[in-house]
């Protein structure tokens, strides 16, 4: 009887050791899927808001330069959650908006590499031009000094020649 109990406990312990990491991985996968859905939805919402501005410009209510300024101001001030923000670069790699960082805005980032050597802006632009999608790279979180892995959703906004994105740190 005692031997059967010890054997049963050993089997249960082995099952727990095998299954618990799988359960943890399943939760990580579900969380990543939820995060992916959130950032895609947020970019689509931002694009919709930019389209409203572009429509007014196309109807002659404002110049293209003024519409782009309004769009940049919108993205600069648009946030979600506790630290969600948007950025935009031109399809040539010139930064339009990056959480209000005036030291970056207006600079060409096309050749910028992350800490792993990835030309991430080129990847972002290529993904957006191909219809939008997810890109993974390393980036420094606002207020920190070390780069962290980041997953972003990006899409092009053709009326302004922009790539708009947002993401989350993994």
Where do the model's predicted regions map?
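N-terminal membrane-sensor/transducer module of prokaryotic signaling receptors
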Residues: 1-170
């Amino acid at each position: 009887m005692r031997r059967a109990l010890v054997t049963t406990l050993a089997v249960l312990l082995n099952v727990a050791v095998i299954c618990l990491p799988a359960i943890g991985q399943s939760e990580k996968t579900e969380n990543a899927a939820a995060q992916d859905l959130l950032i895609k939805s947020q970019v689509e919402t931002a694009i919709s808001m930019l389209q409203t501005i572009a429509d007014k410009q196309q109807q002659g209510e404002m110049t293209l330069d003024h519409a782009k300024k309004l769009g940049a101001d919108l993205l600069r001030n648009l946030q979600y959650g506790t630290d969600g923000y948007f950025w935009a670069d031109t399809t040539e790699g010139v930064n339009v908006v990056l959480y209000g960082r005036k030291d970056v805005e207006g600079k060409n980032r096309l050749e910028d590499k992350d800490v792993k050597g990835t030309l991430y802006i080129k990847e972002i632009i290529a993904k957006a031009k191909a219809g939008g999608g997810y890109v993974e790279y390393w980036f420094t979180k606002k207020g920190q000094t070390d780069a962290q892995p980041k997953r972003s959703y990006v899409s092009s906004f053709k009326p302004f020649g922009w790539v708009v994105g947002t993401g989350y740190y993994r």
